[in-house]
Amino acid sequence: MPPFRLGAVLLALTLPIVAEAQSLPDNPLSDCPDTPNCERVARGYEASPDTLYAAAERALESLGPVTLRRPDSSAARRLEAVYRVALLFKDDVAVAIRARDGGGSALYVRSASRVGHSDLGVNRRRVDRFLEAVGTALRDASSTS
């Protein structure tokens, strides 16, 4: 693939994401404990809070949760999901979205195991898949509008 095409593809893949250096509102999700069974990240996007919320909802659904809740919150748009791991173990995922000063939105996600000390990277991989699915949903939304 010619270098200019590769650059165009990479630009298109990262277009919905705002540079991380720009400030994000304070993270409304709980901190992770000092154990390696939790992942908590924040990302900035150019999309409106409503568009990002819809993309996050589709992304969570695509990962096959046991349950997906949409709690009412005036401070931040929130989603909560439970995923089953192995036979009996459950992991909790929380998502919050806030408007950023100057436009765009901040997306916060926290994925944590309910029990155990280590999750062997399960929550990190889930967050990575979730963020990838959010990017895909945003690209799909922008191509249909």
Write out the residue ranges for each language-model feature.
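Positively charged n-region of N-terminal signal peptides that target proteins for export
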Residues: M1-R5
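Bacterial N-terminal signal peptides
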Residues: G7-P16
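Ser/Thr-rich, low-complexity intrinsically disordered terminal regions
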Residues: A19-S145
